[in-house]
Amino acid sequence: MKNKKPRKFITQAPTLSLLALALLAGSVQAEDIGERTDQGTAMLASLQSEQGLIYLNADVWLKRQGATPLMTRDQLRERVLARGERLFIDFSAVTDQSERQQTRKAMEQLAGISFDADWVLVSGYKGELLFTPLGGVDDPAFYQVMERVESLEGQGKRHKRSLTQPPAAEAGLPHVAFYLNVNRKISDAECTFPRSRTWSRGDRLFCDSPNISLVYRVNLERSLQFGNTGSATPDAKIVRISLDEESAGAGIQLNEDLTWSENIADYLLLDGWARDYATDAIAQDYRFSIEASNTKAAVLKSLPTNLNSKYEHREISGFEVGVTGGVEVNKDGPKAKLEASAKFSQQRQLAYNTQDYRVERSAPSAQKVSFSWVRDQYATAESLLSSKTATVWGMGYDVDHNRIQPLSYKGFVPNLDVIYKAAPDETGSTEFKIDSSVNIRPIYTGIYKHYYVVGAHVSFQGFEDTDKRRRVTASTSFKVDWNHPVFTGGRPVNLQLGGFDNRCLSADANHGLSAVTCDETSAAQSFIYDQYGRYVSAQDTRRCLDGNNLGQLQSCSLSLGQRWEWKADSDALSNLSAHQLLGHDKQSGALGLYDENGNPQNVSVRTLTSYTRIFGPPASH
């Protein structure tokens, strides 16, 4: 049974123009790209409104292999950030593992990353894309994100007014930035414990609407080596994962307030346990771990270090990267080769207020780091008691709630910053796994009656039953492709053919080259002019423009045929092997190498170049 709500429907458009018009139409109706799956239909049917929702069946990517991409990264940012729309990607119909990998690759080309999830929701958050991998049909994160987004019109207007733009220097740094939403409801079963530790009185729920809701901030970028030994910036591919003051999310919640229940001995008692109490759950510890799946990536820097309890501090976690062009664009602009010419400090604001918890950092390997906020002040049930003994008439609940800071059970938001590095020539991919967990513990205390013929008194005792604790973890992961063009460190440029009014060099899925209408958001038309003078394809960084075969991109090498140099004060691009200029037929656009003078009348050797924006922020509105 299909959802009957009004929406557009796109299967395979016969031409790019029709598809592009549909993608950029900006209608408030729901829009489908591909047939909805039964599971996708069921998830969306429960929504009150599908206004501003784009449904994408990942199977469409398989059917369109070799075709022009459905959507560029810049178009995705435009629709989600400027117009307030949301993209729901459904992978559930792709069950074959090799085909699943192909669809993940397509998502990497669109967004820079991919997830091992059946569904991924893409929305906006603080001026960047927010990715929410969904763990199942009934994952509450889906509904929470959808409900958080108000009407399309209001959302779009707000984003246009308050879109968070990075500082000018950072905006010029080639990087891919996004937020990762980690949202997990803690089930009733996970927070249900015995009502009494002394008697069999059944179980009860020790939490009230518990959940883990965190927003991690992720940056993918390249640092080029710059400076002298000792102070030089690293020559490395960088992945930075943070929970800072610009991200963090709602935090980890167990309870809004702490309540307690009482159990009384139901038999005549002279000496023994008279009563026990069960107080709502708090966190014995919070733990956060980040791990790379292979040795391609290693931890370069991580914060916080070990911290004492009752520690309050704010700091800036800075990291210097070597960049090309510095804060200002290189004087040669897009004709400049890739080389480090300045340092740029990328900063994160971190705040610590440990209160009852100490922080322990652990790095069991070069690929893994973990941070634990471990209860240190009043860490045991015994230490929470305000009295040790009393008369038999003084029996009652004795846990001092003033010794339990709210951080122990509600709104806990950590701050941390982890930077991974990979070799500058690293290839393949790495999965980054993030675990966010809380160790839930009820507080059990009891009253023991001591009888000694001539009198009696009671003692208050606390219990540390480790079997009555439970760790709940929210796990997520994302895959990074080390061949992504952002890791070259260069700003992408195009090659525009001067014999036409508006034609640029473009590569197809089989690496064939042709002249097409210029599009500054197209990865197929984007190249990195690297330190060797090669034009490396941003669509596939293993392929380069080769003067020995100008009809098709070739595997990159250091051959002179792949090295190019701009003639001074001109629009002429010279090949270092042939010592001839790149030219093209003014009718067909076919490329060739020609002498500087005496060329046929139908040939132009004028080539222009300008920056493209395949992973930069959208144009201002």
Swiss-Prot record:
InterPro entries: Hemolysin_N, Hemolysin_N_sf, Hemolysin_pre-stem_dom_sf, Leukocidin/Hemolysin_toxin, Leukocidin/porin_MspA_sf, Ricin_B-like_lectins, Ricin_B_lectin. GO terms for molecular function: carbohydrate binding; toxin activity. Keywords: Cytolysis, Hemolysis, Lectin, Signal, Toxin, Virulence. It comes from the Bacteria. Transmembrane segments: none annotated. One of its GO terms (cellular component) is extracellular region. Residues 491-610 form the Ricin B-type lectin domain. The keyword Signal applies. Gene3D superfamilies: Hemolytic toxin, N-terminal domain, Leukocidin/Hemolysin toxin, cytolysin domain, Leukocidin/Hemolysin toxin, pre-stem domain. Residues 1-30 form the signal peptide. GO terms for biological process: cytolysis in another organism. Disulfide bonds: none annotated. Belongs to the HlyA hemolysin family. Bacterial hemolysins are exotoxins that attack blood cell membranes and cause cell rupture by mechanisms not clearly defined. This is Hemolysin ahh1. The gene is ahh1.
